[in-house]
Amino acid sequence: MGMSFSHLLIVLLIIFVLFGAGKLPQVMSDLAKGLKAFKDGMKDDGSDNDNDKNK
């Protein structure tokens, strides 16, 4: 059972109320940077294991 469209709208509305319109772009930017860093870290982590197997 996943999130329906109405659940997503409710979550977005709560986020909008908590952070306000002025702070929301900064919060989303920080979130995107964090996700990108996480993905890059996961990518780097996998390549280290491949190098260890070849030795």
From Swiss-Prot:
Keywords: Cell inner membrane, Cell membrane, Membrane, Protein transport, Translocation, Transmembrane, Transmembrane helix, Transport
GO biological process, one term: protein transport by the Tat complex
Domain of life, per lineage: Bacteria
TM helices/strands, residue ranges: 1-21
Localisation: Cell inner membrane
GO CC entries: TAT protein transport complex
Coiled-coil spans in chain: none
Pfam family, one: TatA_B_E
Gene Ontology molecular functions: protein transmembrane transporter activity
Entry membrane topology: Single-pass membrane protein
Cited Gene3D superfamilies: 1.20.5.3310
UniProt similarity note: Belongs to the TatA/E family.
Protein task: Part of the twin-arginine translocation (Tat) system that transports large folded proteins containing a characteristic twin-arginine motif in their signal peptide across membranes. TatA could form the protein-conducting channel of the Tat system.
Record's subunit section: The Tat system comprises two distinct complexes: a TatABC complex, containing multiple copies of TatA, TatB and TatC subunits, and a separate TatA complex, containing only TatA subunits. Substrates initially bind to the TatABC complex, which probably triggers association of the separate TatA complex to form the active translocon.
Stated name of the protein: Sec-independent protein translocase protein TatA
Protein's organism: Rickettsia peacockii (strain Rustic)
Gene: tatA
